[in-house]
Amino acid sequence: MVVHELGIGTKSRSSPGVSRRELLLTTAISLIFSTTSASALDVKGSLPWSANAGSPPTPVQPGPWVYFTADEGAAIEALVDRLIPPDPQTPGGKDAGCAVFIDRQLAGPYGKAERLYMRGPFVDGTPQQGNQSSLTPAARYRQGLAALDKYCRSKYAGKSFVQLPDNEKDKLLAGLEKDEVRLEGANGRAFFEQLLQNTQEGFFADPVYGGNRNMVAWKMIGYPGARYDYRDWVERHNERYPLPPVSIGGRAG
C-alpha cells in the first residue's frame, strides 16, 4: 500500500472516512493473521509448572543503537516517522519506538535469518512464495540504507533522507513502493516492503521488545494486551473494556 495515500497519519485520500485508528486496527489484524510460521514446545517435568518460567522474554533496554550506526539510526527514525506519522492523539513511529524495535530485531536471530533456510539456489519466485533473496534482514537494511542515502544525496543536492521535507520523503517512499525509484546496488521495493512490515510489527508488538512505547498502539485500538482473565466480562457484550492493557512482562499501560 502507498502509505501517504492511505493516510496512516490522518484521513485516507483513497478511502474517505477511514480514520487513522481504523486503518491501524486493520493493520494489527492483518499482522495477527500474517504468514508467520508457528512453533510449539513440549513442556516436560514435574508439577507445578508455570508459563514462561524457563524462558521469559528479556525486555529491551533503552540505550545506544545495537545494530545500526548513528547515521543509519537517524535515517530509520525518519523513515518510520513517515510510515506512521504523528498526529495530535498518537505519537508517530519514532516516538512509539519502532526504530528501536527494528534495531534490536536486526541485532538478534531475526536479523541473521537463523530460522530460515538460507541456502541456494536463489531465484526470483512468485509473490506468494515470499522472499527468495540470499540477503538476511540485517544485510538488506544495511544495503538498502546505504543505497537510499546515495540516491538522496545525488538527487537532492547532497541532502540525506533525514534532511528532506516531509512531502519529498513521502514521494520517495511512494516511489520505492511502486518500484518507480531505483536504488543503485539494492532492491528498493524489497527494502521498502521489509521496512513497512517491521515498522508495523514494532508499532503493535508487546513493549517488552522495544516498540509500542507505553502501549500507545494498544490503547489507540482498545487492545487489552496479555490479560489472562476475562471471566467477569464473558457475558458483557458491546461494552468498552475499561482496564488498561498489560504487557507480557506484567506491566499495565
Model-identified regions with their sequence ranges:
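Onset of an N-terminal alpha helix
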Residues: 17-20, 69-76
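N-terminal twin-arginine translocation
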Residues: 17-22, 31-52
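Terminal targeting/low-complexity segments that flank the catalytic cores of oxidoreductases
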Residues: 3-4, 40-60, 64, 231-253
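Flexible, low-complexity segments enriched for small/polar residues
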Residues: 54-65, 76, 80-188
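N-terminal secretory signal peptides
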Residues: 1-18, 29
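Long, amphipathic alpha-helical surface segments
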Residues: 181-253
